[in-house]
Amino acid sequence: MSAVPGPVYGLEVPPGEILIPAAMEFPASSLSVAGASFATPLVLPAGDLNSNQKILQFRITMAAVDPTEEPEADGEGNIPTVPRSTLRLVKRALPGLEDEDDEIDDEYMKALLAGSDDEEDSDEEANGGPSDPAKAKKQRQAAAIKKLLESAQEESDEEMEDAKPNGKAKGKAKATEESDDDEDEDSDDDSEEGADLENFVICTLDTERNYQQPLDITVNHGEKVFFVVTGSHTIYLTGNYIMDDDEDDEDSEDEDEYDLSPDELEYGLEGDDSDASDDLDGLEDPRVEEIDTDEEEAPKLVAANKGKNKRAAEEAAGLDELITKEDAKLSKKQQKKLKNNKGEAVAAEEKKDAKKVQFAKNLEQGPTGSTTEKPKQAKDSKPATGVKVVQGVTVDDRTVGNGRTVKSGDTVGVRYIGKLQNGKQFDANKKGKPFSFKAGKGQVIKGWDIGVIGMAIGGERRLTIPAHLAYGSRGLPGIPANSTLIFDVKLLEIK
């Protein structure tokens, strides 16, 4: 799975305490519940997605007001001397909870927003009264949303009193209106549910000096997030959808070699395309003999490297090995190699895979060149690995690649595994389309912009990135604030 930038995201948040859902699953109309208005964002056209893509999240990068727009008066009909608007974000305190009892299901959320439950539906429910624990919990959640909105308003107590439910969201609000005594009894529960909601001020914009504000807010698909604006002007949010591209690039030999185990690679080469398959049908025995030869020579190369460089044999763990260790489909023969040769067996297998790909490619050209070039390349290759600190990022070269190196402005494609210092993995790109970005241009965290400079194709690095060069004090889902991050990165291509 790999994340790629998608179409432009846009959302209009009008003033007047209107609660705007940022997600994409809600009905395409402006609705209201518990005295608070709701509206939906722009719906992504189906034509913008291909069959292999789905929305993972969206990233909001700009908030702006139109200074030429006529300001809206407040509830008393007054227009401030300096028109301004404040943007707030309302969200669940713990997004993505797995416990079904602690989250509002999608059907209920739609019903809550649409307010379309009629009295007949309410009468048909088996346990339709406040005594039903599930329904009472949902009523408390609706009341908590209402209370949060009322606390954000700067209107009088009488105006807030007018904002009580008035027949909207009938199926869920009707039981709340039945008895004021019931509301008093559940006040403690309402406060407890209200603790699940958080209200954050994002920015305040005016029409004289601060027309716009750059942001960097990423909202996961399905996360319950809303925006509210108080003031005189509409605030416009823009950004990009982030898509999941599961399309496998069958034409890339490097990707196939990287993703598959030796047995899977051999099978894939036999059936990858019709022309190659036809050529290999008559050469099955020589092909098997060549693979056996590689397996016999590989331990010799490992032994030679082990004698020259103990550090590479004892502690260097390449990205290929990390991915292989996580693969539950390893054969017994591969597991035996990993056990006897520690990390080096993986390097030997990688060279064997490369040999097989090269051999299959050269079958069409004839039996010249391939058998003599590979040992020479292995003999001349002398990786200069080591640990150094570059602008605060600790760079540990595990494998040095070949060819030209990455410079600022190059577009690169990489595989990576990201972990916290306690070893917990929070992100990875191990198969499918490589993760691509432009180095040194701010498209990724600062530590990556620094850490990939100087890598060559095929090279592997471990980047230890301090918090101030990663996500700082804000953190992300799965990444606590002020976390030092460790990335194992392999460079596949430079464009």
Swiss-Prot record:
The annotated regions of Basic and acidic residues compositional bias extend over: 373-382
Where mainly located? nucleus
Q: Where is the PPIase FKBP-type domain?
A: 409-495
What's in the keyword line of the UniProt record?
Answer: Chaperone, Isomerase, Nucleus, Rotamase
Hey, what's the signal peptide range on this chain? none
In terms of domain of life, where is this protein from?
Answer: Eukaryota
Where are the annotated segments for Disordered? 115-198, 243-312, 333-385
Pfam family for this entry, one: NPL
Known regulation of its activity is: Inhibited by both FK506 and rapamycin.
Where are the disulfide bridges?
none
SUPFAM superfamilies noted in UniProt: FKBP-like (SSF54534)
User: Any idea where this protein resides?
Assistant: Nucleus
Q: Where is the composition biased (Acidic residues)?
A: 116-126, 152-161, 178-196, 243-283
Q: Which reaction does it catalyse?
A: [protein]-peptidylproline (omega=180) = [protein]-peptidylproline (omega=0)
Protein task:
PPIase that acts as a histone chaperone. Histone proline isomerase that increases the rate of cis-trans isomerization at prolines on the histone H3 N-terminal tail. Proline isomerization influences H3 methylation thereby regulating gene expression.
Q: What quaternary arrangement does the UniProt entry report?
A: Binds to histones H3 and H4.
The similarity annotation says: Belongs to the FKBP-type PPIase family. FKBP3/4 subfamily.
Q: What is this protein's name?
A: FK506-binding protein 4
Gene name for this UniProt entry: FPR4
